[in-house]
């Protein structure tokens, strides 16, 4: 998969959105992984009705959480995140 990155002061900048739900062990691991790499991300809580409805409208076939998007590209769940970070050299 190709990730479009912008290079700014201080190196590579990525926009990361993580869709999570409480009591989701893989969500916790994904967030810990991003934090351990020093990457900032925006968390979208699927326990919130409006977030859940908007997500399922855009991605009706996706049932697994977490769901991670890097620079507007869906990388999938935890395994997808791990592969994306490896591909990016992070």
Write out the residue ranges for each language-model feature.
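Local sequence-structure signature of Cys/Sec-based thiol-disulfide redox active-site neighborhoods
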Residues: 12-39
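Conserved beta-strand positions in the Rossmann-like core of class I SAM-dependent methyltransferases
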Residues: 42
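Non-catalytic, surface beta->alpha helical segment in thiol-disulfide oxidoreductase systems
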Residues: 70-90
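Alpha-helical elements of the RecA-like P-loop NTPase motor core of helicases
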Residues: 28, 53, 83
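Short, Lys/Arg-enriched N-terminal segments with co-localized hydrophobic residues
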Residues: 1-13
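Thioredoxin-like thiol-disulfide oxidoreductase module
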Residues: 45-62
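Short alpha-helical
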Residues: 25, 50, 76
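Structural micro-motif
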Residues: 59-68, 78-79
